[in-house]
Structure formats: C-alpha cells, structure tokens
C-alpha cells in the first residue's frame, strides 16, 4: 500500500489566506477590523428596522451555491456581512427591541466571549483545563451569594453550580437526575407511571425535557392557572391534580415552578409548592430564567423565598444579566444526583485528578461531553461592573417599564392586562364603545342620541383579540419598534419587555408615541364588521 505524497496534492492558492490559519499578526489585523465593525454596528443600530424585513429564502437567492474555491479577504467578507447578512437580522440589541425577553449584551460579555473563544479549550473535566473548571465553580458561588442562595446550593456549602447552555438543558439534567433517583428506589420498570408537573404558563422547555427524559407524554401536567392568582400556579390546585394522579396509580416525580413566566412574568409561590412537593417526595426545580437576575436586588429577592426547600434553581445570565448567549446558571443541592444520572467514565478519560475525588468534572453535570469556557464571560461581567452597577442596570429597566406602564394606564383606550412585576408590561387596545349589555335588545343610546351595539363578554373578547392582532401587526410593520404577543386567560395581549442594554427612557417614550399614532389610525377607521368574522 503506497503512502500519500502531500506535495502531489497541494493546490495553488491565491495570496489571501495563504498564511497559517492562526497566524498571530493576521489575527491582530483582522481582529481589530471586526472590533471596529461591531463598534460601528452598535453606534448605528438604531438606524436599522428592529425586525428584519426580508422574505423567507432571501439569502439563498443572494449567495453562491458553492463555497469559494480560493480564499477571500476579510474586507470582502465584511462587505457581504453588511449587504447580505445585516438586512436579515432582527436586531435584538436595538434600544427599540421589546419583544420576547431580552438577550442583553455588554462590552464585558462580548470581550469575555472573545477570550473564551480565543483560548478554545475543551473543559470536559478538570484535567482538560483546570482554570476553566475552577473559575466556573468560583463564579457560580459568587453569583449564588449575590442571590443570597443558601449554602446548600454552593460549593462552599454542600451543593454546587454549573453553567449550561439553556434552560431546557438545565431542566433536562435535573429531571434526569430526579427520574433516576426515583427509579433507583421503586424500580426502573415503573418509568411509565412517573408524572411531571408545571402550569399552563410554564415554558415549553419543561415539556420538551420530559419527552427527552422518557416520561410518558400522557403524564405531563400543565396545571391550569387563574387570573385571581395573577396566573401563578396555586399550590392547592397542584395538590388536587397530584391526588388525582395518585388515585390513578401514578407517581408524582417533578414540579417546575417559574419565577417570571414567559407570557406575563407571573411568579409561582415557591414555598407553598415546595410544601406540597415534599409530601410526595418530588423534585422541585425553580425556573427563574428571566426574572432570577433581578433577585440580586434586595427589593426583588422575596420572589425566590422558599428556594431553600427546592432541589435546584436556574436562571439565564444571557437574558437579563448582560452576559451574551449562551449562559444558563444552574445550582443544585445534591450534585451527586446529577453525577449518578449523567456520568460516563471511559478509559481514555481516566486520570489521577478525577480518581482523587478532589475535583469537579463538569462533563458529569451536563448532557454533552465537550463544553465551552462560559465562566470567562460571566467572570468578566461580574468584575467589570460589580454588584452595585449590575443592580442599578436592572433597576433602570424596571423604572423605564414603570414609566411605560404609567403612560398606558393614563390612556383610557388601553388596558393593563396583568400586573407588572418586573420590567415587562402587558397591555391591549380596547375596542370602541366597550360597554356591557344592559338591555334585551342589545343596543344602547348614548347622550348624543347615537345608537351603539352592545356586546356580551365573549363577543367583546373575540373582538378585542382580533383588534389587537391587527394593531400589533401594523405597529411591527413600521420597523421602528418590535413587540410580541401572548394569550393568557383567553386574552390576546401585547408584551412590552424592557431589557436591551442600550434602551433609554427616550426610546420608551418613542415606542409609546408609535403605539398612540397607530391606535389613532386603527380606531379612526374602526369597523366592527371587519373584526367580527
């Protein structure tokens, strides 16, 4: 069998890119260009439509069908980023972005990501990169102390923390640990009887995690919430559902209360839910993906009261903690449950440090083997801004949300649909002549002798929902602001989530002016027939 003669297969290449792919001087030159490019982008980000205006498939029509045979210059590539990629971006860092939840960025977060990516280490166990492992444990304890988590969640106590990519990963890992802990007691043949509980407001990540973990889809419970409890999960309702399941021969396994639901930022009562769960030996995981960060502020800490009774707690630092995607912080009281459920120990990974049991091997705290050096960017954020400034950044967003809430509340054409808890306001535009039926004929004569059609509550709801769908669509079409919607308790409402790092009060005022302008337009041309079909 002949050997390969590499000289025979080397091909001629143009000058661009002929240097080593990791040449330090070329890295310096191109790196400066990228930094300048991004700095200009953030300087000018307000000039772009917040939501991309392109049609599906736009990019395939504009880029070649095959990769370039010869290298191209960074200058050419950045020109294409400007002309082809940026038009297809929805600008999540725009100060006029109020959709979904924020994905807040910061200089420290970006630079921390640059360091992490630049080192490009694979820290699956302590031996593979000791600094990556140890820094992660340190920053998770720092952050846990900022949240005033009990020592049972910290490495300095009896627990510990790990950086996952997303909430879905955090829930899947803890659910897997809960599943195995339970099945080791009752026998693995009973997996089909295990039940997972959330509310009808719980993030879909819980249902996805349950599917992946092998929970019978029929045994996933989205417990109904009610307006009387601000759409939080009532412990009494949870108990009723659990008792019904036990009567049916099922086994309660896992419940996931939320601090700041996606639809309305509702807060489930952690303490009472933990009391119920404890009676039935259930694992309690607290999903504080959005609002958990706010709990570093003393005035918001009470929202996670009861965390000491739960088993695990997670939040997304990439949402509202200026740390850039992806960075989900997960704390657990019993790390051994995670390790037992998730560890593998092939011969090629064996080493003295692991066998000493004096180190953490984070590969056993997550789904994948490889892992990124996420702790670097969180460390950069914590050090660059400090607790005081981080609290004040969060408070500024809450203050701006309060300003917006006041503007909406002062305009009788609008309604605040659920109480504001953090930095998101949920509201809707009301249809004209919103009056309740007070007579059998369904009409009402006002003081000016004008006859107005009266509507029952269901008709009113249908009409208001359709009106707000059209209204939001028109507002988004302007490109100047971006908001999204939710349906809670049957009510279609508009979500205004303040959280972009660049947002200032003037941007909030501008958003309100856009909303008022389009409310004037849609109401001036209002024809009930157009919204009733």
Swiss-Prot record:
Query: Which cysteines in this chain are paired by disulphide bridges?
Result: none
Which Pfam families does this UniProt record tie to the protein?
Pyridoxal_deC
Question: Is Transport there in the keyword field?
Answer: no
N6-(pyridoxal phosphate)lysine modified-residue sites: 319
Q: Would I find Coiled coil among this entry's keywords?
A: no
Which key words are in the record? Decarboxylase, Lyase, Pyridoxal phosphate
InterPro entries given in the database record: Aromatic_deC (IPR010977), PyrdxlP-dep_de-COase (IPR002129), PyrdxlP-dep_Trfase (IPR015424), PyrdxlP-dep_Trfase_major (IPR015421), PyrdxlP-dep_Trfase_small (IPR015422), Pyridoxal-P_BS (IPR021115)
Q: Which GO terms describe its molecular function?
A: 5-hydroxy-L-tryptophan decarboxylase activity; L-dopa decarboxylase activity; pyridoxal phosphate binding; tyrosine decarboxylase activity
Catalysed reaction(s) here are: L-tyrosine + H(+) = tyramine + CO2; L-dopa + H(+) = dopamine + CO2; 5-hydroxy-L-tryptophan + H(+) = serotonin + CO2
Biological processes annotated in GO = amino acid metabolic process; carboxylic acid metabolic process
Membership in a protein family? Belongs to the group II decarboxylase family.
Protein name, per record: Tyrosine/DOPA decarboxylase 3
From what organism does this protein derive? Papaver somniferum (Opium poppy)
What gene is it encoded by?
A: TYDC3
């Amino acid at each position: 069998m002949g050997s390969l003669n590499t000289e025979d297969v080397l091909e001629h290449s143009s000058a661009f890119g002929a240097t080593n792919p990791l040449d330090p001087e070329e890295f310096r030159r191109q790196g400066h260009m990228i930094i300048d490019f991004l700095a200009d982008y953030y300087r000018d980000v307000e000039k772009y439509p917040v939501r991309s205006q392109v049609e599906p498939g736009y990019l395939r029509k504009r880029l070649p069908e095959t990769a370039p045979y010869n290298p191209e210059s960074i200058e050419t590539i950045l020109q294409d980023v400007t002309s082809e990629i940026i038009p297809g971006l929805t600008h999540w860092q725009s100060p006029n972005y109020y959709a979904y939840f924020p994905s807040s960025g910061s200089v420290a977060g970006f630079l921390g990501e640059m360091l992490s990516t630049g080192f490009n280490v694979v820290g699956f166990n302590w031996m593979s990169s000791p600094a990556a492992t140890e820094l992660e444990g340190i920053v998770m304890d720092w952050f846990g102390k900022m949240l005033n988590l009990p020592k049972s969640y910290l490495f300095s106590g009896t627990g510990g923390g790990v950086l996952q990519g997303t909430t879905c990963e955090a829930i899947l890992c803890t659910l897997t640990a809960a599943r195995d802990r339970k099945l080791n007691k009752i026998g693995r043949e009973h997996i089909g009887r295990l039940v997972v509980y959330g509310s009808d407001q719980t993030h879909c990540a819980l249902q996805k995690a349950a599917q992946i973990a092998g929970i019978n889809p029929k045994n996933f419970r989205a417990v109904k919430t009610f307006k009387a409890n601000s759409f939080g999960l009532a412990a009494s309702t949870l108990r009723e559902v659990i008792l019904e399941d036990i009567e049916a021969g099922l086994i309660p396994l896992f419940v996931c209360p939320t601090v700041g639901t996606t639809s309305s930022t509702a807060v489930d009562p952690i303490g009472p839910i933990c009391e119920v769960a404890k009676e039935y030996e259930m694992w309690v995981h607290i999903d504080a993906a959005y609002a958990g960060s706010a709990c570093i502020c003393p005035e918001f800490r009470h929202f996670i009261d009861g965390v000491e009774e739960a088993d695990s707690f997670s939040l997304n630092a990439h949402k509202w903690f200026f740390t850039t995607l992806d960075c989900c912080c997960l704390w657990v009281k019993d790390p051994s449950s995670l390790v037992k459920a998730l560890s593998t120990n092939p011969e090629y990974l064996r080493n003295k440090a692991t066998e000493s049991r004096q180190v953490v091997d984070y590969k056993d705290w997550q789904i994948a083997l490889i892992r990124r050096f996420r702790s670097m960017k969180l460390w950069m954020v914590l050090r660059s801004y400090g607790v005081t400034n981080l609290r004040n950044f969060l408070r500024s967003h809450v203050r701006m949300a309060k300003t917006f809430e006041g503007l909406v509340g002062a305009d009788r054409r609008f309604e605040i649909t659920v109480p504001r808890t953090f930095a998101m306001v949920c509201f809707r535009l009301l249809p004209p002549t919103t009056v309740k039926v007070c007579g059998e004929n369904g009409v009402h004569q006002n003081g000016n002798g004008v006859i107005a059609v009266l509507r029952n509550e269901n008709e009113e709801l249908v009409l208001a929902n359709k009106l707000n769908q059209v209204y939001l669509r028109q507002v988004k079409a302007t490109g100047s602001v971006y908001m999204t919607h939710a349906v809670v308790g049957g009510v279609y409402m508009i979500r205004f989530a303040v959280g972009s790092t660049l947002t200032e009060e003037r941007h909030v005022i501008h958003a309100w002016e856009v909303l008022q302008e389009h409310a004037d337009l849609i109401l001036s041309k209002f024809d009930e027939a157009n919204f009733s079909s």
